C-alpha cells in the first residue's frame, strides 16, 4: 500500500513532449506497476479488489508534458486517450496536464502567446517543489537558428554560451523543474561533455 501511495503521487514531465512517445512509455510503466501490485495482493491475500479506473487516475495525476508545436500536443493527447479508452467511459480532459508553450521562455515579449510560466501552469506540482521525474528527448537546434531569443537565454540561463545548441538550455530547464529528490533522464548527444560550448552546462550539472 505504501508503494501504491507513492506511485499515485509521482509526477512525471517531458518538457519537449512532441507527440507523446515518452509520456506513453511512462503511462505504460505506471499501469504495469499498479497491475503488479493488484496481482501480488491477490496472490498473497487470496483475493482483493483491483484499483478502479487506474488509467484515468494516472493521466490526471502523474503525467505532464509541454511542447511548442500545437499539432504535436494534440497528437500527444490523442495517443494517451487511445491508450486508455474503454467502452462507456468518458475520456479525460488532458488540457490541464499536456500543454502548448515555450518550455524555455516565460516572457511574452520574447515568446508571445507561447510564453510559458511553469509555476502558474502546474501549481499543484510546484507546491511540492517540482516534478519527481523529468524525461525526454529535447530538440537539437544549432545556435544560428535561434538568434532572436539569445538575449533572453543569456540573461536567464547559467549555461548560456553564444554557440551552444538549444538542447543545453533544455538540460538546465529540466534540472530546475525537478524537486530536490527528483530524477532526470534525457536522450542527448555527448558533444556537450567535451565541447567548449558545453563548459557552462557541465558546471550546472555538477
Give the label of every model feature segment.
Residues 1-206:
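SAM-dependent methyltransferase catalytic region
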Amino acid at each position: 500500500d505504501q508503494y501504491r501511495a507513492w506511485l499515485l503521487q509521482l509526477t512525471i514531465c517531458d518538457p519537449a513532449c512532441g507527440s507523446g512517445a515518452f509520456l506513453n512509455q511512462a503511462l505504460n510503466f505506471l499501469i504495469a506497476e499498479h497491475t503488479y501490485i493488484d496481482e501480488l495482493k491477490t496472490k498473497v491475500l487470496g483475493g482483493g479488489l483491483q484499483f478502479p479506473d487506474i488509467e484515468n487516475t494516472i493521466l490526471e495525476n502523474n503525467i505532464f508534458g509541454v511542447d511548442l508545436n500545437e499539432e504535436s500536443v494534440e497528437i500527444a493527447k490523442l495517443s494517451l486517450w487511445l491508450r486508455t479508452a474503454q467502452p462507456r467511459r468518458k475520456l479525460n480532459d488532458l488540457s490541464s496536464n499536456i500543454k502548448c508553450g515555450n518550455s524555455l521562455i516565460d516572457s511574452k515579449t520574447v515568446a508571445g502567446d507561447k510564453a510559458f510560466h511553469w509555476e502558474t501552469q502546474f501549481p499543484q506540482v510546484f507546491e511540492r517543489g517540482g516534478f519527481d521525474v523529468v524525461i525526454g528527448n529535447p530538440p537539437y537546434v544549432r545556435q544560428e537558428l535561434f538568434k532572436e531569443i539569445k538575449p533572453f537565454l543569456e540573461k536567464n540561463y547559467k549555461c548560456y554560451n553564444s554557440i551552444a545548441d538549444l538542447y543545453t538550455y533544455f538540460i538546465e530547464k529540466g534540472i530546475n523543474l525537478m524537486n530536490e529528490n527528483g530524477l532526470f533522464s534525457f536522450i542527448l548527444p555527448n558533444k556537450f561533455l567535451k565541447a567548449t560550448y558545453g563548459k557552462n552546462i557541465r558546471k550546472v550539472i555538477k
